[in-house]
């Protein structure tokens, strides 16, 4: 009898009805599809470059790791305002949404200009940081050359990427997840087509190798930006915030202050987290160019599978954020519990598939056997820890939806710099431990974050309406 009551209580707390899951999937699936197609094409892009040679693949992957830091800077810059956007939309305050959009615009412009200047001045030095491990002088020189070629072209794609993030994030926070997905699909088709034409020189197109891959990516970003921006302004009946959006670019000082208070820790968090990921890769790269190549393969494959917990985490921010904005705290807590449980269960199933298929993926690349073998085991280790990452991602967005950005800053980037990076740094430089063991130790350390996240979510420190308070 007692056990039956416990089961009923568990089901009520963590398992929703059909209507609940349909609501969650309506938000999550379009994000999954968009990110899934993007990451799948990135995989194909990666394989196409990988078919040319290991040095070309490694050079492009190092640059992508550096640009990833910029991408997350933009994500962090717009996400601080996005917390307010979701809650303003929950209150049907369209002027509030406009003002948060304008804040996003200025923040993204500042970050983009700063990034372009940084890469133009010290880009070659940044690439060289990843070329200090084992490898011949010729291999290192070739990897640096291809990386520099790739970077110079990719910088042209930062402005359209910036605009896509500003518009798409606002649309999603207002409940429109389908259009960004459609724009992403079109852009991906453009990217894939021109990758094929320009990397290999098909028909009358020149054979440009890594430069062709970069040109294709830049073209696709301009196409995506054109679609998202034009659709938003042609459908003002659906996007009320777009009416008079550019009548002024001023942002009220009081709102700017509020967003900065909540958003600056988030911006620092994303920037520090991304730079920590780049630092972790640099630590692993000490063990040689084969490690750089294998990390590139495994990370690309991992990104395809990670779309599930990433989309469900984004859904937590959107759905729970709107409930908090509407002042329904009880429903927000109940919904959050069920969404976290759903994310972990889904990702456990995905991890099993990923683990079984791990030996097959590296065979798609034209690289040496050692790099393939390393990539296989890196994928397996990541699959093993995927349920843990799903829980962490969902708890992170739970805390962020309630404006607890200082806590998320400590929870995320401070932890990775104070725990994960030192583990990788010390083990890679001062021990002979195999790189796979180092990688697993870094993943295992995140169990500490799981405990912290569980306590914070259970306490309900995130249950607040920040746009009213």
Name the predicted role of every residue range.
Residues 1-28, 85-157, 207-263, 320-385, ...:
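Short alpha-helical transmembrane segments in multi-pass integral membrane proteins
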Residues 32, 36, 40, 44, ...:
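Generic alpha-helical transmembrane segments of integral inner-membrane proteins
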Residues 36, 40-58, 127-141, 199-208, ...:
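Helix-terminus/linker motif at the lipid-water interface of multi-pass membrane proteins
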Residues 54-65, 147, 151, 214, ...:
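Small-residue hotspots at the loop-to-helix junctions and early N-terminal turns
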Residues 57-117, 161-180, 281, 292-358, ...:
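Small-residue-rich hydrophobic transmembrane alpha-helices
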Residues 78, 153-172, 180-188, 213-229, ...:
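Short runs within selected transmembrane alpha-helices of multi-pass transporters and secretion channels
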